[in-house]
Design a protein with these regions (language model features):
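Juxtamembrane boundary at the C-terminal end of a transmembrane helix
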Residues: 158-164
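Interfacial segments of alpha-helical transmembrane regions
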Residues: 2-14, 66-92
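Portal/gating segments that form or line small-molecule/metal binding sites
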Residues: 70-85, 95, 101-102, 107-111, ...
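Interfacial loop at the N-terminal end of multi-pass membrane proteins
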Residues: 13-63, 107-136
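Hydrophobic alpha-helical membrane-embedded segments
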Residues: 12-21, 88-104
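Core segments of transmembrane alpha-helices
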Residues: 54-67, 146-155
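Membrane-interfacial loop-to-transmembrane-helix junctions in polytopic alpha-helical membrane proteins
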Residues: 1-4, 42-52, 73-80, 128, ...
Length: 164
């Protein structure tokens, strides 16, 4: 059972890292886009990145915490799993603080299903009148920072596996 949980944790962390890293790797090219093209591209990420990234991120938090509880308390493996869980929590916090408010702005005029409208309606609408380049930079940098912490979570889970 422990090995299965370790493998699932690493796969979920890899999914989380892939979504955030994908955004980070395309950043140099997207920063060269004119407003018209950038705004046309932004809505295409939904639903793939939203569903895949969300599943990976929430899954990493839950499964890495479960893994930490399954390992001997105070062991290096347990401590590393808890650190991975903390890193995954930071990835989620960064999403809600930096990325989600901008996603809400990008998708405000998009035709999406009712459940998605509900999801993107969560949180304050603090983007009214904001300059598009400020929103772009916030979104792009937010994903770059998230990629660092998502990668860290994956590395910590791999280290936990090695230490177990």
């Amino acid at each position: 059972m422990l090995v299965a949980v370790q493998i699932i944790a690493i796969l979920l962390a890899a999914l989380s890292m892939t979504a955030a890293l994908g955004h980070a790797l395309e950043m140099p090219g997207k920063l060269r886009l004119a407003q018209e093209h950038y705004l046309a591209v932004q809505p295409i990420y939904y639903p793939g990145f939203t569903i895949g990234g969300g599943l990976g991120e929430i899954g990493t938090i839950v499964v890495s915490a479960a893994l930490a509880l399954m390992l001997p308390p105070g062991s290096a493996a347990s401590s590393l799993a808890w650190a991975a869980c903390a890193s995954a929590l930071i990835v989620q916090a960064l999403y809600w603080l930096l990325v989600h408010p901008v996603n809400k702005f990008w998708l405000k005029d998009s035709e999406i299903d009712a459940a998605s409208k509900g999801f993107f309606a969560i949180g304050a609408d603090d983007q009214a009148g904001a300059d598009w380049t400020m929103l772009r930079d916030r979104w792009e940098r937010g994903h770059a920072i998230r990629a660092i912490f998502a990668t860290l979570a994956l590395v910590l889970l791999a280290a936990s596996l090695a230490a177990a």
